[in-house]
Design a protein with these regions (language model features):
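Short amphipathic alpha-helices and their capping/turn segments at secondary-structure boundaries
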Residues: 2-6, 33-35, 113, 120-124, ...
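A general structural detector for well-ordered alpha-helical segments in enzyme core domains, enriched
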Residues: 28-32, 61, 71, 185
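Active-site PLP attachment segment
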Residues: 62-124
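Short, flexible/disordered intra-domain loops and linkers
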Residues: 20-27, 99-104, 168-173
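Alpha-helix termini
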Residues: 2-6, 33-43, 94-103, 129-130, ...
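Active-site phosphate-binding strand-loop segment of PLP-dependent enzymes
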Residues: 1-57
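A short acidic (Asp/Glu
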Residues: 22-25, 55-59, 82-84, 182-186
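Conserved PLP-dependent catalytic core of the aminotransferase class-I/II
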Residues: 123-187
Length: 187
């Protein structure tokens, strides 16, 4: 019920949770959808879906509330390379983040235009995602934004590997190892 309060602007969700990899229930999702649609349509949701590969038939909040939700995913957990910090952010093209920027006061819009004026001729038209990328590398260094070449290559290899493994053998092996370790720890 707290999320019905329009003073609450953003919800951060780890789904599935860590370390148990338990996803939000259908009832919980339906309740959240109802709250957003009926009471707080400008609620921004950031969902950390890093552990989704460990949950069968996982369905992200991004697919349930695409307008309101920014998703975060990392290859690092699934492929056991946590030191690499390889991840991605995904956002629907039509989203609350862009629309809220358009609703800012003239003063705030001017501040943002001043911040991003070196990126393009019309900074008011920059999307939230473009601003996020620019801010990830400091606006002045935006021309170097993104991952380094070794990281890009590693993410490409991980993506290709996951596409080739059509029977999810690696995923099942990883889940079996996690279950085995849990049993060893608690039994």
């Amino acid at each position: 019920n707290k999320l019905k309060d329009k003073n609450i602007k953003v919800l951060f969700v780890v789904n599935p949770n860590n370390p148990a990899s338990i996803a939000l229930s259908r009832d919980c999702k339906d309740n959240l959808i109802s709250v957003v649609k009926e009471h707080n349509p400008e609620l921004m949701i950031v969902t950390d879906d890093v552990y989704c590969t460990f949950v069968d038939n996982f369905n992200s909040l991004v697919s349930e509330l695409p307008y309101n939700t920014l998703g975060v995913y990392s290859y690092s957990k699934y492929f056991g390379v946590t030191g690499w910090r390889l991840g991605t952010i995904f956002l629907n093209e039509k989203n609350i983040f862009n629309d809220l920027i358009k609703k800012l006061s003239p003063y705030m819009k001017n501040e943002l235009n001043e911040r991003y004026k070196h990126l393009c001729q019309n900074p008011a038209e920059l999307s939230f995602m473009d601003r996020l990328v620019a801010d990830s590398r400091q606006v002045a260094l935006n021309h170097t934004a993104g991952l380094s070449t070794p990281q890009q290559v590693q993410m490409a290899f991980f993506s290709l590997f996951a596409l080739i493994d059509t029977e999810n053998n690696y995923k099942q092996l990883t889940k079996d190892i996690c279950k085995s370790r849990k049993n060893l720890l608690f039994n």
